[in-house]
Each structure stands twice: as C-alpha cells, then as structure tokens.
Swiss-Prot record:
Quaternary structure note: Homodimer. Heterodimer with KCNK2. Heterodimer with KCNK10. Interacts with calcineurin. Interacts with YWHAH, in a phosphorylation-dependent manner.
Name of the gene this protein is made from: Kcnk18
Region (Interaction with calcineurin): 221-226
Name the record gives this protein: Potassium channel subfamily K member 18
Modified positions (Phosphoserine) in chain numbering: S275, S287
Annotated K(+) 4 binding sites: T138
Keywords noted in UniProt: Cell membrane, Disulfide bond, Glycoprotein, Ion channel, Ion transport, Membrane, Metal-binding, Phosphoprotein, Potassium, Potassium channel, Potassium transport, Transmembrane, Transmembrane helix, Transport
Family matches, as Pfam families: Ion_trans_2
A single MF term (Gene Ontology): calcium-activated potassium channel activity
Residues the record lists as binding K(+) 1: T138, V139
Sugar-bearing residue positions: N94
Amino acid sequence: MEAEEPPEARRRCPEALGKASGCCPEAPGKARGCCPEALGKLLPGLCFLCCLVTYALVGAALFSAVEGRPDPEAEENPELKKFLDKLCNILKCNLTVVEGSRKDLCEHLQQLKPQWFKAPEDWSFLSALFFCCTVFSTVGYGHMYPVTRLGKFLCMLYALFGIPLMFLVLTDIGDILAAILSRAYSRFQALLCLPRDISKWRPLLLCRKQTDSKPADEAIPQIVIDAGADELLDPQPSREPASPSCNVELFERLVAREKQNELQPPMRPVERSNSCPELVLGRLSCSILSNLDEVGQQVERLDIPLPVIALVIFAYISCAAAILPFWETDLGFEDAFYFCFVTLTTIGFGDIVLVHPHFFLFFSIYIIVGMEILFIAFKLMQNRLLHTYKTLMLFVCQREVSLPC
C-alpha cells in the first residue's frame, strides 16, 4: 500500500504545481488585469496604422478618379502641336550639311515636357496608391505627379493631412523599435559582460526625468487630522498642551484649507479591480490615454552607440537591395541600394524609375520601419553633435577665463 500523504503536503501541492507550471492561483486575475494594459499599448499604434492605410486607399480612389479620366483638351494641346511643328521644320534640313541645325534640334528637344505624354491609363488604382504613399511619406520621386488643376489642389489638401498622420505613425512605431533595439543591445552587453555605464550623452534628459517625477505627490493636497495636526501646520510647535482657543483656530484653518481644495477641479479616481468586469473598459481607456501621453518618449530615452545603429541600417538596406532586382531586372545591387537609401531618407530624386511599382507597394511596411530607423539614427547623431558642441564651447570658455587680462 502506498503511504498516505500528510495534509500539509497536499496543501502545498497546488502551489508547487502552480509555480512549476509558471502559473499560480492569482494568475487568472493578473492575466485579466494585464490584458487591458497590453491592449492599451497596442491599440493606439494599430489605430494610427489603420487610419494611414485607409487614408492611402481613399486617396488612391480620388486620384485615380480625377487624374485617370480622359481630358479632351489634352489631345489637342497647342503647346505640343507647336513643339512638333518646329521639330518637323528642323528635321527637313540636311543635318550633314547644316551643322547648326543639329544644335537647334538639341536645344529644342530640351524643351520637351513630360506631362504632354501623360495618359489617363497611367493612373490606375495601384499607381495612384503608390503616388499617395510618396506624397504623405514626403519622398516625392517626381516622375508621377498630378497634371489637372483639380488634381493639384487635391494633392495639396491631401498632403496637409497625410504628412502629420504619417509622422504620428512613425513616432508610435519608433517607440516599439527603440524598445526592441534597447533590449537587444542590453542582451548583447550581458552576453559580452560589458559594463552598463550611465550615458553621458543625455544629461538633460535625466534631469528632466527627475524633475518630472517630483511633483507627483506634491500636486495632490492631503489633509491629515490627528494628534499631530498642529505640528504639520506650525513649523515650530510648542511643547505645551494645546488650549481650546488653539483647537478652534486649528479647526478654522483646516476648514479654510478644505474649501481651497474644493475650488480645484476634482481628480477622478481610477479604481482597479480584477474581479469586476465592468471596470475593464475604464482601465482600458486609462491605459490608452497614458500610452498616448508617452508617445515618442521611448525614442528620447534610447541611447545606443552609433556604430551599432549604422550596422543595423546597412543590413536593413542591403536586404531590400538584394530582393528588389528580382522583379526590377534593370537594377543591380548598387542601384537598388542607392534607390532604397534615397527612398528611406525621403530625398526622392526620381532619377531611378521603377518599372513595376505595384510590387514595391508590398514594401510599404519596409519603408515605414526603415524611415523610423533612420530617424532614430539621426536623433542619436544629433545628440552626439550637441554634446560635442557643448564640450567645445565649455573648453573655449574655460580657456578665455584662464587667459590673463
């Protein structure tokens, strides 16, 4: 017969099993409490991204409808007709005899305008979607642009709302990337057993964090009525017992303090409970609002060496440069690398034109993430340059002070 387990062992078994399996009796309540917070962190970014995708689809439908319809005036363009007539007159001459006609032909061909050959068929839905992505991402390659008057006004209005929305998405995604880069670099430091020193590049940020964390308790006035209340109000309390007149005066001062606090707008308390499902919506809204207030803070706190971020950028662009020539057969690795760099830095010269821009739409997420990585790199470089400039100015000022008059 098997030995019967003592009751203490039976009582400890569920706890031991719970710890061994990674859960405990309080885990369901904690999981329910963590779900609104996790959803509150993901929901703003997902909403921003969905708004940007919807905005791009609506813009593609508008531009394909405006620029894609046939224009009867474009078929009889007087400017194009005049250009062709002059070109025919130049070509009637014998170019081998008249050498000046060749120069006139070259100068005349330089006056050629690309919009003369823009066809409505070029503005399909996918082409218009590609154009919208180049507008609100501020890339603007230049080989695709609106020609009609209505299309130009629509493009300006579309950019006014699309560019801030794009920057908002970039800021939110930047926090995620900054958290990933910071954790990856911390694990890399732990693997190599490198010391984690406090960064010297962000002293102002640390001071700002300390000052921001101070007034949290000072902003909420508290009234404590106890035996030592007169000690709180009087900086030099007397050791003699309080008289009735002092008690009346103390009570009047407390009432005046309470009335003054009532004039301030009351702060709505946030109740937290894992057993009441009605409070889930309240916790979710509070989590969303708190995360919206912290948008962009993770990027400001990020501090990793510039060679690390430069290596990440090089690897990121190289991956796209190796994939892009599979459908853009005219591009080699060097041209594809150059095109991706010009795109991610929002320079957008327009010297390289994609033959199949529809396939490049699948790289929309790639473009957004790449632009954010470059933004983080530029932010880190800016902090380094500011630190170098401050160090140089301090050195110059100290040298001027040390010089004799």
